[in-house]
Amino acid sequence: MNILSLVQTALELGLICSLTVLALFLSYSMLNVCDLSTDGCFTLGAAVGATVAIAGHPYLAILAAMAAGVLSGFITALLQTKMGIDSLLAGIIVNTGLYSINIAVMGGSSLLNMNKTETVFTKARALLQGTVLTEQYKLLVAVIAVAAVVVFLTLFLRTRLGLAIRATGDNPDMVRSSSINPAFTTIVGLCVANAFTGLSGCLLAQSQKSVSIDIGTGMVTIALASLLMGQVLLGKGSIFKRAMGMVVGAFAFRLVYTIALRLDMPAFMLKLVSSVIVVLAIATPYFKKQLPMLRRRMAARKEARRYAED
């Protein structure tokens, strides 16, 4: 097993998927909305991006995928804020509807092949030809995309609108009393978050040079696991630190996932691996809190035994 190759593969996929984790960070951690349309939106971004790239516009494909994500987020937010539908149910409804839309975008097929299609990655490889970064062209594109999103998110959440979005997640009643419409901030937050998800799907499709209808299946679980791992690894702090925690968490998750693949683990077991990682990530903070209490109990028992022996 080539360790460097394994780490590079995990880093490339981790960075691309970290865009979805950052989307979940905005919607779930900041806005306090459980958006279950992530799977469908990811596939939508991949399908739209692949279709536009096949038409000969790889750069335009990125913008189109993000626009499709914005539209998906807008519909999800509209169901919640204007129709009184619970956020969980709204996400499920949109995710279900997106399956048919994604098939339609892909021309009625469940698989798109992009082997002969020029992508942002092939353009980057041609640009870096003959340099020391020739073999790292995918990694470079992923780093640029993630850096741009992290910087944007850090600056955006410091603006008045960004602060209003954060306040909406913390206390919507206070936001409402401050003459800020929480419905508006929810719509904007979900539109931005889903734009990141669409971008993530588009980049993964162009990286793999293929799109299947189930490319986004389980993505919300993967993103949640990565988010929780990032919180455990880097903890709380500034927006930039927390955003970087999402990137680190995505890489850590993909590293474990890639190792499982290299160990010839059956494909049907990988979903179980994802579930176990989620459980461990959620339970770790709890066990950290319980550890001092456990130590005190053990110390008390030792003290009691010492007195009993005396």
Model segments located where?
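Short loop segments and helix-boundary regions at transmembrane helix junctions
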Residues: 29-34, 74-128, 209-213, 225-244
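Alpha-helical transmembrane segments within multi-pass membrane transporters and channels
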Residues: 24, 57-96, 249, 253
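Transmembrane helix-bundle core of multi-pass membrane transporters
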Residues: 87, 91, 98-158, 187-188, ...
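Loop-to-transmembrane alpha-helix initiation sites
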Residues: 13, 87-89, 116, 138-143, ...
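Transmembrane alpha-helical segments in multi-pass inner-membrane proteins
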Residues: 196-271
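Cytosolic-side transmembrane-helix boundaries in multi-pass membrane proteins
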Residues: 170-177, 181-184, 256-310
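Membrane-interfacial amphipathic/re-entrant helices at transmembrane-helix boundaries
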Residues: 1-20, 48, 54-60, 131-136, ...
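Helix-loop-helix "hairpin" substructures at the membrane interface of multi-pass membrane proteins
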Residues: 72, 135-215, 220
